[in-house]
A protein has these predicted regions:
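Conserved functional loop/turn residues at catalytic and ligand-binding sites
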Residues: 5, 15, 107, 121-122, ...
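A ligand-binding cleft/hinge motif common to bilobed small-molecule-binding domains
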Residues: 17-28, 94-98, 125-159, 236
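Short helices/loops that flank or line small-molecule/ion binding pockets
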Residues: 1-6, 93-94, 98, 112-122, ...
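An extracytoplasmic/periplasmic, membrane-proximal ligand-sensing/linker region
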Residues: 101, 161, 186-248
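Non-transmembrane alpha-helical segments in soluble domains
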Residues: 2, 64-67, 115, 119, ...
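Alpha-to-beta junction loops
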Residues: 3-13, 73-77, 99-101, 119-126, ...
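Hinge/capping helix and adjacent helix->loop/strand transition within the periplasmic-binding protein
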Residues: 3-9, 24-113, 162-164, 175-208
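Short beta-strand and adjacent tight-turn residues that come in two discontinuous sequence segments
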Residues: 11-14, 42, 108, 127-129, ...
Length: 248
Protein backbone atom coordinates (compact mmCIF):
# COMPACT_ATOMS: atom_id res chain seq x y z
CA UNK A 1 0.00 0.00 0.00
CA UNK A 2 2.80 2.44 0.76
CA UNK A 3 3.87 2.22 -2.92
CA UNK A 4 0.34 2.54 -4.28
CA UNK A 5 -1.00 5.65 -5.96
CA UNK A 6 -2.43 7.92 -3.27
CA UNK A 7 -5.85 8.28 -4.89
CA UNK A 8 -8.00 6.25 -2.51
CA UNK A 9 -8.14 3.15 -4.70
CA UNK A 10 -5.85 1.16 -2.38
CA UNK A 11 -6.82 0.72 1.27
CA UNK A 12 -5.01 -1.42 3.85
CA UNK A 13 -6.82 -3.23 6.67
CA UNK A 14 -4.32 -4.13 9.36
CA UNK A 15 -4.22 -5.12 13.04
CA UNK A 16 -2.66 -2.78 15.56
CA UNK A 17 0.33 -5.05 16.13
CA UNK A 18 1.73 -4.42 12.65
CA UNK A 19 1.97 -0.70 13.40
CA UNK A 20 2.17 -0.38 17.17
CA UNK A 21 4.25 -3.42 18.18
CA UNK A 22 6.40 -4.59 15.27
CA UNK A 23 8.42 -1.33 15.15
CA UNK A 24 9.83 -2.42 18.52
CA UNK A 25 10.33 -6.13 17.80
CA UNK A 26 11.98 -5.73 14.40
CA UNK A 27 15.08 -3.59 13.98
CA UNK A 28 14.38 -2.97 10.31
CA UNK A 29 10.83 -2.77 9.02
CA UNK A 30 10.11 -2.18 5.32
CA UNK A 31 7.60 0.49 6.27
CA UNK A 32 7.14 3.51 8.55
CA UNK A 33 3.75 3.29 10.32
CA UNK A 34 3.36 7.07 10.32
CA UNK A 35 5.05 8.33 7.16
CA UNK A 36 3.91 5.55 4.83
CA UNK A 37 0.26 5.37 5.84
CA UNK A 38 -2.66 7.77 6.17
CA UNK A 39 -5.27 6.81 8.81
CA UNK A 40 -8.80 6.47 7.43
CA UNK A 41 -10.99 4.74 10.02
CA UNK A 42 -10.99 2.09 12.68
CA UNK A 43 -12.72 -1.11 11.62
CA UNK A 44 -13.20 -3.35 14.64
CA UNK A 45 -11.88 -4.30 18.05
CA UNK A 46 -11.53 -7.53 19.97
CA UNK A 47 -10.28 -8.73 23.33
CA UNK A 48 -7.76 -11.42 24.13
CA UNK A 49 -8.62 -14.46 26.20
CA UNK A 50 -6.70 -16.86 28.44
CA UNK A 51 -7.91 -20.42 27.95
CA UNK A 52 -6.88 -23.72 29.50
CA UNK A 53 -7.32 -27.30 28.37
CA UNK A 54 -7.44 -30.72 30.03
CA UNK A 55 -3.87 -30.47 31.33
CA UNK A 56 -5.14 -28.01 33.94
CA UNK A 57 -7.37 -29.47 36.69
CA UNK A 58 -11.07 -28.60 36.62
CA UNK A 59 -10.64 -27.03 40.06
CA UNK A 60 -8.69 -24.17 38.46
CA UNK A 61 -11.33 -21.58 37.60
CA UNK A 62 -9.48 -18.24 37.65
CA UNK A 63 -6.16 -16.70 36.71
CA UNK A 64 -4.95 -16.48 40.34
CA UNK A 65 -5.73 -20.19 40.71
CA UNK A 66 -3.90 -20.91 37.46
CA UNK A 67 -0.84 -19.06 38.76
CA UNK A 68 -0.93 -21.09 41.98
CA UNK A 69 -1.14 -24.27 39.92
CA UNK A 70 1.88 -23.16 37.90
CA UNK A 71 3.82 -22.49 41.11
CA UNK A 72 3.00 -25.97 42.36
CA UNK A 73 3.92 -27.49 38.98
CA UNK A 74 6.90 -25.48 37.69
CA UNK A 75 7.71 -28.06 35.01
CA UNK A 76 4.33 -27.28 33.45
CA UNK A 77 4.62 -23.48 33.64
CA UNK A 78 4.11 -22.96 29.92
CA UNK A 79 1.77 -20.69 28.00
CA UNK A 80 1.38 -20.50 24.24
CA UNK A 81 0.32 -18.03 21.58
CA UNK A 82 0.01 -17.97 17.82
CA UNK A 83 3.25 -16.04 17.22
CA UNK A 84 6.42 -14.87 18.92
CA UNK A 85 6.60 -11.11 19.30
CA UNK A 86 2.84 -10.67 19.23
CA UNK A 87 0.74 -8.89 21.85
CA UNK A 88 -0.62 -12.31 22.80
CA UNK A 89 2.94 -13.43 23.57
CA UNK A 90 3.60 -10.43 25.78
CA UNK A 91 0.28 -10.48 27.63
CA UNK A 92 0.88 -14.06 28.73
CA UNK A 93 4.36 -13.30 30.04
CA UNK A 94 3.25 -10.11 31.78
CA UNK A 95 0.48 -12.03 33.51
CA UNK A 96 3.01 -14.50 34.87
CA UNK A 97 5.46 -11.83 35.98
CA UNK A 98 2.73 -9.91 37.79
CA UNK A 99 2.02 -13.09 39.77
CA UNK A 100 5.67 -13.89 40.41
CA UNK A 101 5.64 -16.85 38.03
CA UNK A 102 8.30 -17.19 35.34
CA UNK A 103 6.32 -18.64 32.47
CA UNK A 104 7.89 -20.17 29.40
CA UNK A 105 6.28 -18.90 26.22
CA UNK A 106 5.79 -21.41 23.42
CA UNK A 107 5.18 -19.81 20.03
CA UNK A 108 3.19 -21.62 17.36
CA UNK A 109 2.75 -20.84 13.70
CA UNK A 110 -0.86 -19.79 13.99
CA UNK A 111 -3.64 -20.49 16.44
CA UNK A 112 -4.93 -23.90 15.18
CA UNK A 113 -1.81 -25.92 16.11
CA UNK A 114 -1.68 -24.19 19.49
CA UNK A 115 -5.30 -25.13 20.12
CA UNK A 116 -4.65 -28.71 19.03
CA UNK A 117 -1.84 -29.11 21.57
CA UNK A 118 -3.94 -27.52 24.30
CA UNK A 119 -6.83 -29.87 23.54
CA UNK A 120 -4.41 -32.79 23.44
CA UNK A 121 -3.10 -31.97 26.90
CA UNK A 122 0.52 -31.18 26.02
CA UNK A 123 0.05 -27.41 26.46
CA UNK A 124 -1.74 -26.11 29.57
CA UNK A 125 -2.81 -22.65 28.44
CA UNK A 126 -3.16 -20.42 25.43
CA UNK A 127 -3.47 -16.66 25.08
CA UNK A 128 -5.45 -15.96 21.92
CA UNK A 129 -8.16 -13.85 20.31
CA UNK A 130 -11.34 -14.20 22.33
CA UNK A 131 -13.41 -15.09 19.28
CA UNK A 132 -11.21 -18.10 18.58
CA UNK A 133 -12.35 -19.71 21.80
CA UNK A 134 -16.11 -19.18 21.48
CA UNK A 135 -17.00 -22.38 19.55
CA UNK A 136 -14.66 -24.45 21.72
CA UNK A 137 -16.27 -23.08 24.87
CA UNK A 138 -19.70 -23.89 23.52
CA UNK A 139 -18.58 -27.47 22.91
CA UNK A 140 -17.14 -27.73 26.42
CA UNK A 141 -13.64 -28.46 25.15
CA UNK A 142 -11.82 -25.60 26.88
CA UNK A 143 -12.27 -23.27 29.84
CA UNK A 144 -11.86 -19.53 29.43
CA UNK A 145 -10.40 -18.06 32.61
CA UNK A 146 -10.18 -14.39 31.65
CA UNK A 147 -10.70 -11.78 28.98
CA UNK A 148 -8.45 -8.76 28.55
CA UNK A 149 -10.77 -5.80 27.95
CA UNK A 150 -11.67 -2.89 30.19
CA UNK A 151 -15.10 -4.48 30.64
CA UNK A 152 -16.38 -8.01 30.28
CA UNK A 153 -16.97 -8.98 26.69
CA UNK A 154 -20.59 -9.24 25.58
CA UNK A 155 -19.61 -12.56 24.03
CA UNK A 156 -18.49 -13.98 27.39
CA UNK A 157 -20.30 -11.97 30.09
CA UNK A 158 -19.75 -14.74 32.64
CA UNK A 159 -15.94 -14.53 32.31
CA UNK A 160 -14.12 -12.02 34.53
CA UNK A 161 -11.53 -9.68 33.05
CA UNK A 162 -7.88 -9.78 34.02
CA UNK A 163 -8.39 -6.44 35.78
CA UNK A 164 -11.23 -7.88 37.85
CA UNK A 165 -8.92 -10.69 38.91
CA UNK A 166 -6.25 -8.33 40.23
CA UNK A 167 -4.25 -7.56 37.09
CA UNK A 168 -5.11 -3.87 36.87
CA UNK A 169 -2.38 -3.04 34.34
CA UNK A 170 -3.34 -5.83 31.95
CA UNK A 171 -6.20 -4.15 30.11
CA UNK A 172 -5.81 -4.68 26.38
CA UNK A 173 -8.02 -4.66 23.32
CA UNK A 174 -6.67 -5.22 19.82
CA UNK A 175 -8.00 -3.17 16.92
CA UNK A 176 -8.10 -3.28 13.15
CA UNK A 177 -7.75 -0.08 11.17
CA UNK A 178 -8.08 1.07 7.58
CA UNK A 179 -5.19 3.05 6.09
CA UNK A 180 -4.53 4.73 2.75
CA UNK A 181 -1.06 5.37 1.29
CA UNK A 182 0.84 8.19 2.96
CA UNK A 183 0.26 11.51 1.26
CA UNK A 184 -3.31 10.75 0.22
CA UNK A 185 -5.13 14.10 -0.02
CA UNK A 186 -7.46 14.88 2.90
CA UNK A 187 -10.61 15.06 0.72
CA UNK A 188 -9.85 11.59 -0.65
CA UNK A 189 -9.29 10.24 2.86
CA UNK A 190 -12.61 11.70 3.99
CA UNK A 191 -14.50 10.15 1.09
CA UNK A 192 -13.01 6.76 1.96
CA UNK A 193 -13.86 7.34 5.61
CA UNK A 194 -17.49 8.09 4.83
CA UNK A 195 -17.82 5.00 2.63
CA UNK A 196 -16.22 2.72 5.21
CA UNK A 197 -18.28 4.05 8.10
CA UNK A 198 -21.46 3.53 6.10
CA UNK A 199 -20.44 -0.05 5.32
CA UNK A 200 -19.50 -0.79 8.92
CA UNK A 201 -22.92 0.39 10.08
CA UNK A 202 -24.68 -2.32 8.06
CA UNK A 203 -26.33 -5.02 10.16
CA UNK A 204 -24.92 -7.89 8.11
CA UNK A 205 -21.40 -6.56 8.64
CA UNK A 206 -21.96 -6.14 12.38
CA UNK A 207 -23.46 -9.62 12.71
CA UNK A 208 -20.81 -11.23 10.52
CA UNK A 209 -17.96 -9.80 12.56
CA UNK A 210 -19.69 -10.74 15.82
CA UNK A 211 -19.51 -14.41 14.84
CA UNK A 212 -15.72 -14.04 15.06
CA UNK A 213 -15.84 -12.15 18.35
CA UNK A 214 -15.20 -8.79 16.71
CA UNK A 215 -16.95 -5.56 17.66
CA UNK A 216 -17.47 -3.04 14.87
CA UNK A 217 -15.80 0.26 15.69
CA UNK A 218 -15.43 3.08 13.17
CA UNK A 219 -13.75 6.44 13.74
CA UNK A 220 -12.57 9.64 12.18
CA UNK A 221 -9.08 9.69 10.63
CA UNK A 222 -7.81 11.79 13.54
CA UNK A 223 -9.24 9.41 16.12
CA UNK A 224 -7.42 6.53 14.44
CA UNK A 225 -4.19 8.55 14.33
CA UNK A 226 -4.54 9.28 18.05
CA UNK A 227 -5.23 5.62 18.81
CA UNK A 228 -2.20 4.51 16.81
CA UNK A 229 0.06 6.90 18.73
CA UNK A 230 -1.35 5.70 22.05
CA UNK A 231 -0.78 2.07 21.07
CA UNK A 232 2.75 2.85 19.88
CA UNK A 233 3.57 4.71 23.10
CA UNK A 234 2.19 1.93 25.28
CA UNK A 235 3.75 -1.08 23.58
CA UNK A 236 7.27 0.31 23.22
CA UNK A 237 8.06 0.13 26.95
CA UNK A 238 6.34 -3.27 27.24
CA UNK A 239 8.48 -4.84 24.52
CA UNK A 240 11.61 -3.30 26.02
CA UNK A 241 10.77 -4.67 29.47
CA UNK A 242 10.11 -8.15 28.08
CA UNK A 243 13.41 -7.93 26.20
CA UNK A 244 12.20 -9.55 23.01
CA UNK A 245 13.47 -8.86 19.49
CA UNK A 246 12.44 -10.86 16.45
CA UNK A 247 15.89 -10.34 14.96
CA UNK A 248 17.71 -12.06 17.81
Amino acid sequence: VKKAVADGSSILLTPMSMLGVYPFTYKKLPYDPVADLAPVSMGSTFDYGIAVGPAVPESVKSIPELMEWYKANPSKANISSSAAGSPLHFVGLMMGRAAGVELTHVAYRGTPPAINDMLGGSMPALCGPLGTFLPLMGAGKIRLLASSGAQRSRFTPHVATLAEQGYKDLVFSEWFGFFAPGGTPAPVVMRANEALRAALAQKDVIDGLAVMGLEVKSSTPQELATLLKASYDRWGPIVKKIGFTADS
